[in-house]
UniProtKB/Swiss-Prot annotation:
Group of enzyme by EC: transferase
Protein name: Ubiquinone biosynthesis O-methyltransferase, mitochondrial
GO molecular function, one term: 3-demethylubiquinone 3-O-methyltransferase activity
Source organism per UniProt: Schizosaccharomyces pombe (strain 972 / ATCC 24843) (Fission yeast)
Subcellular localization: Mitochondrion inner membrane
Annotated gene: coq3
An example Gene Ontology biological process: methylation
Coiled coil: none
Subunit (UniProt): Component of a multi-subunit COQ enzyme complex, composed of at least coq3, coq4, coq5, coq6, coq7 and coq9.
Pathway(s): Cofactor biosynthesis; ubiquinone biosynthesis
Role played: O-methyltransferase required for two non-consecutive steps during ubiquinone biosynthesis. Catalyzes the 2 O-methylation of 3,4-dihydroxy-5-(all-trans-decaprenyl)benzoic acid into 4-hydroxy-3-methoxy-5-(all-trans-decaprenyl)benzoic acid. Also catalyzes the last step of ubiquinone biosynthesis by mediating methylation of 3-demethylubiquinone into ubiquinone. Also able to mediate the methylation of 3-demethylubiquinol-10 into ubiquinol-10.
Phenotype of gene-disrupted mutants: Leads to respiration deficiency.
Length: 274
């Protein structure tokens, strides 16, 4: 069964202050999954592995994600033997890559259509047998009895209803001294211009309605939240997309460029005493 057959078979807060009050500052642990967001990504699922479809930017970003993780881990063959949990895996773009690099990956997504696409695509590659497990669900609701060396959650935070609660759920799945690797979008006017106005409405390289500005979280807000929980920030870097070259560029360590004003990656380490 080829990729086209798979794709054809699967069918597809008024202000940030209010969002923060409901999310980061709320002590109530609520479910983070948004029905509207799940419906949106169910629609995108049918083109997840189409390089010219709505997930094209994620395909182009994937090697940059792996580069960031490799630099942060500072280990040779850094994925080999690692137990990794990939939350919000979508169709499995990152999950498959990490499994091919030697990790044992458990991948979870709230979209049933995305998980169906991911399973069928992974079945095409025998190398992934025994290395990659897909689960339909959420980090709060999925039966995950163990903790992991690494938890990844890429391009997901900007889509959840309760970011604070969601982050706590992610953090619980990381073993002591393990890593949490995140990527999301900063809540700045530049990010709004680039990710919503330009990417969605002008260039149409991202489906309209994919992003909600009020859900974006600034890099300093996210890093400060993690520090308050006594986590160590290993690295935080911006990543910029050049539509002319059609490529993503990762900021150099310590860079104070414009990258953190839009898309950014963050790696944090759980304290041993946690």
């Amino acid at each position: 069964m080829n990729s086209m057959n798979i794709l054809n078979k699967v069918k597809n807060v008024k202000s940030y202050t209010r969002l923060v009050r409901q999310g980061f500052l709320s002590q109530q642990r609520n479910h983070s999954v948004s029905v509207n967001e799940v419906d949106h990504f169910n629609e995108l699922a049918k083109t997840w592995w189409d390089w010219d479809g709505g997930s094209r930017l994620l395909h182009l970003m994937n090697s940059t994600r792996l580069d960031f993780m490799t630099e942060v881990f500072r280990e040779r063959n850094c994925f080999s033997g690692k137990k990794i949990l990939d939350i919000g895996c979508g169709g499995g773009i990152l999950s498959e890559s990490m499994a091919r690099l030697g990790a044992s990956v458990t991948a979870v997504d709230a979209s049933p259509m995305a998980i169906e696409v991911a399973k069928k695509h992974a079945s095409l590659d025998p190398v992934l047998n025994g290395r990659l497990e897909y689960i339909h669900g959420s980090v709060e609701g999925s039966q995950l009895p163990t903790t992991f060396d690494v938890v990844t959650c890429m391009e997901v935070l900007e889509h959840v209803e309760q970011p604070r609660d969601f982050l706590f759920s992610l953090m619980e799945k990381v073993k002591p001294n393990g890593r949490l690797v995140l990527s999301t979008i900063s809540r700045t006017l530049l990010a709004r211009l680039l990710t919503i106005t330009l990417a969605e409405h002008v260039l149409r390289i991202v489906p309209v309605g994919t992003h909600t500005f009020e859900k974006f979280i600034r890099a300093d807000e996210l890093s400060n939240f993690l520090k308050e929980q006594n986590w160590i920030i290993n690295d935080i870097r911006g990543v910029c997309y050049n539509p002319l070259k059609q490529q993503w560029t990762l900021d150099k360590p310590g860079s104070s460029g414009l990258g953190l004003s839009c898309n950014y990656f963050l790696s944090a380490q759980k304290p041993m005493s946690a």
